């Protein structure tokens, strides 16, 4: 075999390697638009977030990237949470059962899709090689415009969307929203639009000024004193589910 034949065979083998086919296609839901946008092939996250057609059309901190495997797992986790809430409600005392029912109703119609653990900040991923994973296969990107609300959820009255205001703390948002029976009196979990979680201490003895960014979810969970042992990690499970929802 001469050198030319060897070079040709080597070139063909390289093209046929998995690396050569390591590309993804992304279906994008843009805010306020009826039709989706398809982007691809893209090799990695940087190629996705720097697409010219996406510039100024979305708010990257609120974007969520998912695939079929992540969605399937998130839906399974969500169904498990809802089943546990229903079982606990049937066993609980009347006042706590009413709180559990309220929480179940709040979570009933969530649009759960899963979230891949990737950063989507264009400025960040372009300079951090470790935050630029390859994209292989089919993905979905959900996006939003910059929000003007936060969402209050959990064992609290008046749950729902509240106007976001710069400088307001989690404690400020809880004003005029009394806790329900069995609520945690010490901490609130802040779920940022990026899916990150921050504990906000809100009791007199541990209060700390925590300002949630726009688009955050504030989860006021169940007190550890009312959670049965078999549901001891239910708050954590619910928070995990809330990080997997399609952004509003």
Curated annotation (Swiss-Prot):
Give the Gene3D superfamilies listed for this entry: 3.10.20.700, 6.10.250.2280, Outer membrane lipoprotein wza domain like
Residue pairs linked by disulfide bridges in the UniProt entry: none
Q: InterPro entries from the entry?
A: Caps_syn_GfcC_N, Caps_synth_GfcC-like_C
Keyword field: Signal
Which one Pfam family would you cite for this protein? Answer: Caps_syn_GfcC_C
Per the UniProt entry, the signal peptide is 1-22
The text of the family note is: To E.coli YjbG.
Name used for this protein in its record: Uncharacterized protein GfcC
Chain's gene name: gfcC
